[in-house]
Design a protein with these regions (language model features):
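P-loop NTP-binding site
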Residues: 193-196, 219-225, 238, 254-271
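Phosphate-binding loop that captures ATP/GTP phosphates
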Residues: 34-90
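Walker A/P-loop phosphate-binding motif and the immediately C-terminal alpha-helix
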Residues: 6-56, 119, 126
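N-terminal regions of ATP-driven nucleic-acid and macromolecular assemblies
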Residues: 8-10, 62-81, 177, 239, ...
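Flexible loop/N-cap segments at domain edges
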Residues: 76-95, 101-128, 135-137, 142, ...
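Conserved catalytic-core segment of NTP-binding enzymes
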Residues: 117-232
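C-terminal boundary of histidine-terminating zinc-finger modules
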Residues: 228-251
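Short boundary/hinge segments that flank catalytic cores
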Residues: 1-10, 216
Length: 271
């Protein structure tokens, strides 16, 4: 087994609309990497499906939103993590109120912090979760920035903020006109893409890369074996071989880029 990372790498994966395969890509990428390296991997779930995908449902519901709605220190976020496999954990979305409204349990501002500052603190806490942190963003908000964050910030704003804050973010997308159109309307950039390729689509890999203005780092063939593995709850123990190989290659590529991005971010902060 090899250790790939030299510093903490945080990668955000997201889709321009539902049904693109983001959560399955994140889970598969994490599973493939922990099997081939000594790195610890944490998934931060902003979409809400990871515990079910990874067979960790019913254990606890406390997670990211609950941490945001408290004044807990960064270390408390790690304590919400569910153990999925050796060196693999998932921090659930949870059920707290990120809006700052009074929920009867102190709201978002018990320590006098607004939502924007608390969300900034979340990214600092995420940095300490594992060697590799994969953020399952889901579908970010179409809003261009956060308006009056202490009063109106919600889970959708959190997802958009995750994309904007990531040193390395990857869009998972099908060669679908509507998905590409939606991407353009979000006014977000991506560093690279994972293309979920379906048969008989008119748009090519090159068309997708041109529209995104970013390279396609991996192509995942639509495979019934993946759906069977997910539907049977066997993704952790029976990751389909073709998907496993694709995710292993993607992990090597993303982690090299992610280490470089993290180093650049550190140099920028130091400057």
């Amino acid at each position: 087994m090899r250790r790939v990372t030299r510093r903490i790498v945080v990668i955000a994966l997201w889709g321009p609309k539902g049904g693109q395969g983001v959560s399955v890509t994140v889970a598969s990428l994490a599973l493939s990497h922990v099997r081939r390296s000594q790195d610890s991997v944490a998934i931060v779930d902003l979409a809400g499906d990871q515990p079910a995908l990874l067979g960790a449902t019913g254990i606890q519901s406390v997670g990211v939103l609950d941490w945001l709605a408290s004044d807990a220190a960064g270390g408390a976020l790690e304590r919400t993590a569910l153990n999925v496999a050796e060196r693999l954990t998932v921090v659930p979305l949870g059920g707290g109120d990120v809006s700052g409204r009074d929920t009867g349990s102190g709201g978002l501002t018990p320590g006098g912090h607004g939502a924007a500052g608390r969300i900034d603190a979340l990214w600092r806490a995420v940095d300490g979760l594992a060697d590799v942190v994969l953020v399952d963003v889901g579908v970010p908000s179409a809003r261009d920035g956060m308006v009056e964050p202490a009063a109106t910030a919600g889970a959708d704003d959190l997802r958009r903020a995750a994309v904007l804050a990531a040193a390395n973010n990857v869009v998972v997308i099908r060669a679908c006109y509507l998905a590409l159109r939606r991407f353009r309307g979000l006014n977000l950039r991506c560093d690279s893409a994972v293309l979920v390729r379906e048969p008989q689509r008119a748009l090519s890999r090159g068309d997708v890369a041109d529209t995104l203005d970013a390279p396609v780092s991996a192509t995942v063939e639509l495979d019934p074996a993946v759906a069977r593995s997910v539907d049977s709850g066997m993704l952790v123990s029976r990751l389909p071989r073709r998907l496993d190989r694709t995710m292993a290659a993607l992990a090597d590529l993303l982690l090299v880029d992610g280490v470089h991005a993290a180093a650049a971010s550190e140099r920028k902060s130091a400057g």
